[in-house]
Amino acid sequence: METKQALVLLYNGVVVTMDQECHVIRDGAVAISGDRIKAIGPTSQILADFSTVADESIDLNGRFIMPGFVNTHVHTSQQLGKGIADDVDLMTWLHKRIWPYESHMTEEDSYLSTLLCGIELIRSGTTCFAEAGGQHVPGMVKAVEQLGIRACLTQSTMDCGDGLPPNWKYTTDECIQSQKELYDKYNNTADGRIRIWFGLRQIMNATDQLLFKTRDIAQELNTGIHMHIAEIPYENELVVSKKGVDHGTVTYLEKIGLLRSNLLAAHSVWLNDAEIGYFASGGVKVSHCPASAMRLLGFAPIKEYLEAGVCVSLGTDGAPSNNRMSMVDEMYLASLINKGREMYISGATNPTVVPAETVLKMATINGAKTVLWDNEIGSLEVGKKADVIIVNPFTWSMVPLHDSISNLVYCMRTENIESVMCNGKWVMKDRKIVNLNEEEIVQSAMKQASNLLERAGVNLPNRMKFV
C-alpha cells in the first residue's frame, strides 16, 4: 500500500524561483508533497487548490521563499582547524598547518568536524554542498545523514608530491580503488542525498596516471571530479617546466582531455584567455571562492568566465582559509570583489560587473549545475526537490525593501534566514537546528579541536601579550 505523502503549504510569501526566466511571485505560495514541489503560484490559487487537503499550512507574512544555496567548494573536515592558518602564505598554510592537521585526523574527528560545519552551512541557507576533499569520507557520510542536507562527497586524493605526511603515501591504484569502494558503498545513500565524486587535490600531487584513471573512471560511473586548479602562479610555472606546455595547469588538462562537463574546477584564478576558452568549450564548471581567494590566491577572472559562457558558482572553501562558512557572506563578497577587480585591471570603475541577480544565480541554479544536480535542485519548479529556505527581510539589516533582489545579496545576513528545508524535511525551523543538539556539538568540537591540534604538533604564534 502506497504511503500518503505529507502536503505542506508555504503561502503569502515572495517566491524567488530562480527558474530559467527568473520569475518572482510577489504574493506567492509553494505546495510541497513529500520531498518534491507539487505546485507554485499565486497564494489565492494555491490555497484554493490545496488548503482543504494540506497537512500543514504556514503563513509567511511576506517573507521570501527561495531555493536553498549550493556551496560548491567546502572542506568540512577542516572545520576543527578554524583559525589555525590565518595571515600566512599558501605553502606555509599547506605544509606547516593544514597537512599536519589533516593527517592526524581520525574518522571521529571528521564526523564531528562535518557536523560543526554543517550547522554553519544550514544557518546560512545551504542545502547542498560539494566536499572539496578530506581523509575520512565515512565520517562525513555519517554526519551528512544526520544533518539532513545534500552533499557530493570527495576523498582528498594524492599519489605524489613533496612533503606529504608518511600516512598519505598511496599508489595510483590505491587512490583509485579506495574511491571506487566509497562510490560503491555510499553513492546515492541517505534517501538519495549523498553522491560520491572523485577527487584530485591538485596537479602538483597527481601523476599522469592518476589524472588519466580518474578521468576515465568518473566518466564510466557518470560522476564528477572535484579539483583545485590554477590557484597560484607557482603552480602554473611548475606545470610549464615539467609538462612542456606554454602556460600552465589548464593548458595541460586540455591537452590530456580532462576538461569535461563533469569537472568542478575550484578557484581557477590564474588562467589566460585561451584557457578560459578551453573551460567554455569543455563545459567545465568553476567554483569561485571570493573570501579565500582574497586571502591566499588573487583575483579570479569571473567577468571573463561569465562573458565566455562558463558556469560559475560559489563556494566558501574551508574554515582555515575563510573562517566563515556562509554563502550569504560569499554572495556579498563575490559582487564587491569583482567590481574592485575591474577597477584594478582597467583603471576605470564599472559597478555593473557581476550584479545582484547574477550572484543569486551563482549561489543557486549555477551551483546545482556545477554539482550536476540541476535536474532536481537549484530552483523552485514543479517536480524538483523541496530544498527551500525562508528569509525574513523585516529586520534592521534589510529594511527598507526598495529593491528586494538587490537586498538579498547586499543586505541579507545569516540571521535573516529563519527556516531551511531539504528533501521536503525541515533541517532548521524558526532558527532552531532540527536534527542535532547544537550546544552539545559545539562543546564537543571545542574539546576535540584542542586535542587534534596537540596531536598534530601545530603551534600558533602569540599575536599579543596574553596574561
Name what the model sees in each region.
Residues 130-134, 197-213, 294, 370-373:
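Active-site glycine- and acidic-residue-rich loops that bind
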Residues 80-112, 155-173, 232-262, 333-354:
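Active-site gating loops and adjacent loop-to-helix segments of metal-dependent hydrolytic enzymes
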Residues 13, 30, 35, 62, ...:
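Divalent metal-coordination and catalytic microenvironments
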Residues 140-270, 274:
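Metal-coordinating catalytic core of metallo-dependent amide/deamination hydrolases
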